Amino acid sequence: MATLTPKLASQIANIPYMVYQGIGDLELISKSLTRHFSFSESATIQGKTGGIPVLDSVPLLRKVIPGAMRTSEAFAVIGIGKGVYQDELVVSIRGTQNANDWITNFNIGYKGAPNGSIAHAGFINSFNSIKNQLKQHLSKNRTPKKIHCVGHSLGGALASLCADWLKSEYSYRVNLYTFGAPRVGLEQYAIKSGNRADKIFRCTHGGDPVPMIPLWPFVHAPYQGQEYRLDSSTKVCISAHAMSADGNPGYLNTASAEEWRALKTRANQYLHTPVRLKFEHRNQASFSEYWANKISAALITLLKDTLLLATVTAQAAISSGLTFYDLLSRHLEKVAKASKVREIQVRGLLGHMLVFAGKPVIAIEDMTASFIRKVFETVIGKLYRVAKQAILAVR
């Protein structure tokens, strides 16, 4: 049973975009792939993204609340393997491509994932909109030896959920391939997801903002595993999220290798590296993946130093979105008041966060929960704005 090559995986990840854009029919789109997989219009899956699921039955609200209704669009394709992939299937899920899709990422909250842990509610809702169609397509084919789940952007998040579901529901052998995918769930999700999939190939560009969100406590799978870093960029760049060959650099271009061992890998151990930031060094920070990771590590170090990590992690699993940052901000206010050492540590963290978000300060005297929450909102807002721009630029 073969693994998809980087080149083949990236080409397959691009197919749903071409279907979505109406570029020819699937037989023509996949002509260069016909040696390995057969695709057809009948194996196209419609999915709903964006909006608020409970409002699907109230069309009148489409006019009243712009973006509240979810849209149904060509969202995924299924390919039947041949040759070295005989008796295997591939499921390729596209990312978001319009503003309406992006409200999915603001469906703040958690839901139970197929692997029994907690994941992003918006991603779960989107996956649930295609699950029944996946079941129907699977019932039409004989039991596959393996299923390859592939996706870019939001499609990578859904491919991860799909892989977990296929393992839980059918006990199929599953490989997962993602390009520029966001974090899907909390720590336990990442651990279980990494343990369930037979192989995970997580591909990123250094400047792609989408894999940087959602922020901790969301964690990438495989937990403490590795990613395939396909370029050498460091600063956040909107174009770094592009899938297409005319992108800069474009995942189709950077994943053109025929073997995975030809690509650079990078370990994801930063969350477990102790980091204590000093306020006087804040201007070293920049809007980059390196500093996004370092700031997350500094926050976790602070919570470990104050014996709060277990408490905060538990609260993350039961409190949604901004409510979690309310709780976290109150914890940090108490920490700052506890001792001069902790006050210095909190101030250093906040100073670096503000510089990261493009809001440098000369001094920080206000250490209230209200101010700390505003700092979190500033950082989150900056990352989401840039990630949204990157998503809207995808073509």
What role is predicted for each listed range?
Residues 26-80:
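Extended, Lys/Arg-enriched charged tracts that mediate electrostatic binding to polyanionic substrates
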